[in-house]
Each structure stands twice: as structure tokens, then as C-alpha cells.
Amino acid sequence: MYNQEVKLTTKEILEKEFKTSMRGYSQDEVDKFLDVVIQDYEVFQKKIERLEQEIHQLRTEAKRAASERQTRHQTSPSVGSTNYDILQRLSNLEKKVFGNKLYE
């Protein structure tokens, strides 16, 4: 997971003032570059928010699936014994209705 803190916000980048000197950088060029950086920051922030929502949703789904799996696992033995009981009853009824002809 990404543990480093973001040092700048889009607002801080936008409001940053640079000192000018005799042979300094072109102010327009710096402003254009910072505009690009701000746009990238906004895109990254939106991606981070979307991915955090997706992580939350997937974790919720995983918990629900695990809970359903556990519930199914707990009820499956009783279903198996119920099926066995039904088959045993059916066998007894067949013996009574058809006699021992089926089992000869």
C-alpha cells in the first residue's frame, strides 16, 4: 500500500509564488508547467478516490461471500442427512407398494 504522504495539494501548486531573478525562468513557461502538474494531481486524486471506493466495495463483497460460504457449510450436513432420510422413506414405501419384487 502507498504509505507516503502527498506533500502538495493542487491549491498549493496553483498559489506557489516563485522569486524572479535577472536570468530566471520564463514565468509563462513555469505557469504552464504548473497547470499541467495541477491537472495531473487532479486526475491522480480522482483515481485514488475511485480505487479506494472499489477496495471498500470488494472488501464488503468478500465478507458477504465468506459469510454465505460459512452459512452454506453449516447447513450442508443437515441437508445431506435430510436427503438420506427421504431416500430411506422412499425405499420403505416402494417395498410396501410393490413388495419385494423390486429387490429380487
From Swiss-Prot:
Q: What's the family?
A: Belongs to the GpsB family.
Q: Record the organism.
A: Halalkalibacterium halodurans (strain ATCC BAA-125 / DSM 18197 / FERM 7344 / JCM 9153 / C-125) (Bacillus halodurans)
Q: Which InterPro entries match?
A: Cell_cycle_GpsB, DivIVA_domain, DivIVA_fam
Q: Which residues form a coiled coil?
A: 34-72
The job of this chain, per UniProt, is described as: Divisome component that associates with the complex late in its assembly, after the Z-ring is formed, and is dependent on DivIC and PBP2B for its recruitment to the divisome. Together with EzrA, is a key component of the system that regulates PBP1 localization during cell cycle progression. Its main role could be the removal of PBP1 from the cell pole after pole maturation is completed. Also contributes to the recruitment of PBP1 to the division complex. Not essential for septum formation.
Question: Gene3D superfamilies, per this entry?
Answer: 6.10.250.660
Chief localisation class: cytoplasm
Where is there biased composition of kind Basic and acidic residues? 60-71
Q: Polar residues bias: where? A: 73-82
Is Cell division included in the keywords of this UniProt record?
Answer: yes
Disulfide topology:
none
Provide the assembly information.
Forms polymers through the coiled coil domains. Interacts with PBP1, MreC and EzrA.
Q: Would you tell me the protein name for this molecule?
A: Cell cycle protein GpsB
Q: Does the keyword Hydrolase apply?
A: no
Listed GO biological process terms: cell division; regulation of cell shape
